[in-house]
Amino acid sequence: MAMITDIYAREIMDSRGNPTVEVEVYLEDGSMGRADVPSGASTGAYEAVELRDGDKSRYLGKGVLKAVENVNEIIAPELIGMDALDQVGIDMAMIQLDGTPNKGKLGANAILGVSMAVARAAAESLGVPLYNYLGGFNARMLPVPMMNILNGGKHADNTVDIQEFMVMPVGATSFKEALRTGAEIFHSLKKVLGEKGLSTAVGDEGGFAPNLKSNEEAITTILDAIKAAGYEPGKDVFLALDVAATEMFKDGKYHFEGEGVVKTTEEMIAFYEDLVNKYPIISIEDGLSEDDWDGWKALTDKLGSKVQLVGDDLFVTNTERLARGIETSTGNSILVKVNQIGTLTETFEAIEMAKLAGYTAVISHRSGETEDSTISDIAVATNAGQIKTGAPSRTDRVAKYNQLLRIEDELADTARFGGRSAFYNLKK
């Protein structure tokens, strides 16, 4: 038994200069696990509750001392003495202790910090890597990175409405090669933007945030960068979009404020169909609002066989919402964010449910990150095949990529790379 002897939480800083929760779990054998909790900028209405203090005189109301106190004063006494190897039992105990459907009492940020730190402590106690502890001997698939190299929407102060324009080096044969490809395209894009006299300042997730004339210009600019880096769009590298359409949805329509255009659901679907026909786009995330279920279904019927349609705000890593999507054949992929649901157990349940239904699962960071690289281990542990964790820029993003390089190195000849097989539900 790896008995928990102490749990301690503190307030630390995330990559946007906002407070977040860090938790340490100590075991009887001297092992310790530490975890930091991420935070999102564009958040779905159905996400688990991130507890903030609301005291405007301190960190503009964004302090997390209440969540820290909940760990130290409420959760710790309940879990001390439990076996850290009983991840499900520990997570269920915290869910029951909270007693709300959305973790609104203790805070998902408090509960998740403990959940991840317990897993890290257990892995250290057993002397195995975290991905191996979580996934077992078959945890060996390195994910295709979904690299956000151009930012708009809530992730940047510019005129681009679509939140993220990403590259996916699907044609690479290893994670190391995929990361190099993405990094070379990133530097190529910086040069392309500089030659056009555009800003090369970066947004929350490390991507550039230039003022472009349209969302389509963002796509063509990235294609120029891919070619300039020596890669072939549609063969070596594909594009992925995160529209974050819920942020645009007002009064039943979608408002592209940067372009000064308003679109209906039907016009949005036609817009995506046109983009997919013109450009090598392999994935579209949150193409419609989180409550536009009929629209999502129509979008899936139209494009679901050839494009990955990822539900982030739609599914919020929640098995109940995912089950509704599966039952109605809505979307074909789930974005997995640990802090949307609040425990590792529930995160793994969502991934398993998606895979059993033939949906893909994309493991994801948040825009507010830390040096914590747990999601890298989760991606390998679940053989998810895809990870979304920003540009190859900013330490809070690169920390995840560096951990994946270490894992690939450690797995050596047994490592596999997701590549095109990561999109197992699309017709070639």
Swiss-Prot record:
One of its GO terms (cellular component) is extracellular region. The active site is at E205 (proton donor), K337 (proton acceptor). Binds a second Mg(2+) ion via substrate during catalysis. One of its GO terms (biological process) is glycolytic process. It is found in: Cytoplasm; Secreted; Cell surface. Mg(2+) binds at D242, E285, D312. Pathway: Carbohydrate degradation; glycolysis; pyruvate from D-glyceraldehyde 3-phosphate: step 4/5. Catalyzes the reversible conversion of 2-phosphoglycerate (2-PG) into phosphoenolpyruvate (PEP). It is essential for the degradation of carbohydrates via glycolysis. This is Enolase. It comes from Brevibacillus brevis (strain 47 / JCM 6285 / NBRC 100599). The gene is eno.
